[in-house]
Amino acid sequence: MKRREVLNTAAIATATTALVSCTQTNTSSVQAGLPNVRWRMTTSWPKSLGTFIGAETVAKRVAEMTNGRFKITPFAAGELVPGLQVLDAVQAGTVECGHTSSYYYIGKSPALAFATSVPFGLNAQQQYAWLYQGGGLAAIQKIYANFNVINFPAGSTGAQMGGWFKKEIKSVSDLKGLKMRIPGLGGQVMSRLGVNVQVLPGGEIYLALDRGAIDAAEWVGPYDDEKLGLNKAAQFYYYPGWWEPGPTLDVLVNLNAWNRLPKEYQEIFKTATVEANLTMLNQYDALNGEALTRLLAGGTKLVPYSQEIMQAAQKISFDIFEENASKDAAFKQVYEQWKAFRKQIFAWNRVNELSYENFASSSQ
C-alpha cells in the first residue's frame, strides 16, 4: 500500500473512531437526562406459549434501547389479573400496560374486533397494511381513547387453524348444540350456526376439552396447540381458521402513563412493538409447519371445512357486520373504511400473490 493510502486510511479510521465516540457520548448525555421508569405488563397468555413472545419482545427491546432506564416486566395471565381482564386493569391504572387480543373486549365496543381479526377478513400482511397505511390504527386508537387507553399492534400469529373437534363436522347440522371455545365475532358466527359458544383463556382450554366441558376449541395453530396438548383431547383438526385469517395482538397502554413518558421513550416503545410484530409472525411461520408434521405423525386427522359450512359462515359474518354497522356509529366508521380497503387489496393480491401461490403450491 502506498504511503498516501496508508495516511488516508489512518485518517478515516481516526475520524470514524472520533465520530462513534462522539455519538456514544451524545447518546449517553441525552439518556442521562431521562428518568428511570418501571412498568408492569399483564397479559392474556401463559408464559409457555408463543403469544407471550410479543410481550417479551417489547419489554426486552425497550430496556435495550434505553440502556435499562425504561424497564417493563411482563406477567402471565392470572399472575396480576385474569387473562380476559387486561383492558379493565389497564384502564383502571392497576397496571401501566397489557398484552392481549382486542377482540376479547367486543362487549365494550364491537369495533375492537377489527384490531385483532374478523371472519373472512385480512391476512397478516394485509392487516398490517390496513393498520399502518390504511388508517386502521388511527381508527382503533380513537375507540380506545374512550377507555383512557392507547393501543399498539405487537404481534401476529398469521392465519390460524379451524379448531379441534372430538367428532367430524361435515355439515352445518353437525354444529348444532356443540359446545366450542371460540371468542370474538367468530364466536358470534358460530353461535348463529347453532354452536354453544364458550370463551376461555388459553390456559384453561385443555382441561375443558379433555374433561368434556366443551366439545371443540380453537386456539392458534399447530405450534401453540401442540404445546397446550389439544391433540391429546381431540382428534379432528379443521382448517382454515376463517374467523382469524390474520390476527394481530395489541399492547394496551394507560393513557395517563403514556403521557407521562418522555417523547424519546414513546418512540422507543412504538419501535419495539413493530419489532414484536415481525418477531412473532416470523416465529409462527417457521414453527407451525414443523409442529403440524409432528401432529399428523401422532395420529391427528387434518380435515377441511365443507363448502356448505364455509359459505354459510361467510354469509352470516357479513350479516353481522352490517347489523353492527346499523346500530353502532364507531363500528360503522371502522367497518366502512376496512371494507373499502379489503376490496382494493384483495383485487391487487389476486394478481400479485394468489396467482403465484396457487401455481407454486399446486406444482409441488
Curated annotation (Swiss-Prot):
Single Gene Ontology MF annotation: protein homodimerization activity
SUPFAM superfamilies (UniProt xref): Periplasmic binding protein-like II
Chief localisation class: periplasm
CDD domains listed in its UniProt record: PBP2_TRAP_alpha-ketoacid
Annotated Gene Ontology cellular component terms: periplasmic space; tripartite ATP-independent periplasmic transporter complex
Annotated binding of Na(+), by residue: 160, 218-219, 244
Subunit structure: Homodimer. The complex comprises the extracytoplasmic solute receptor protein all3028, and the two putative transmembrane proteins alr3026 and alr3027.
Changes seen on gene knockout: Impaired pyruvate uptake.
Keywords of this entry: Metal-binding, Periplasm, Signal, Sodium, Transport
Signal peptide: 1-26
Entries under Gene3D superfamilies matching the protein: Bacterial extracellular solute-binding protein, family 7, Periplasmic binding protein-like II
A GO BP entry: organic acid transport
Regions that span the bilayer: none
Protein name: Monocarboxylate 2-oxoacid-binding periplasmic protein all3028
Biological role: Part of the tripartite ATP-independent periplasmic (TRAP) transport system involved in the uptake of monocarboxylate 2-oxoacids. This protein specifically binds monocarboxylate 2-oxoacids including pyruvate, 2-oxobutyrate, 2-oxovalerate, 2-oxoisovalerate, 2-oxoisocaproate and 2-oxo-3-methylvalerate. Is not able to bind mannitol.
Binding site for substrate: 103-104, 160, 181
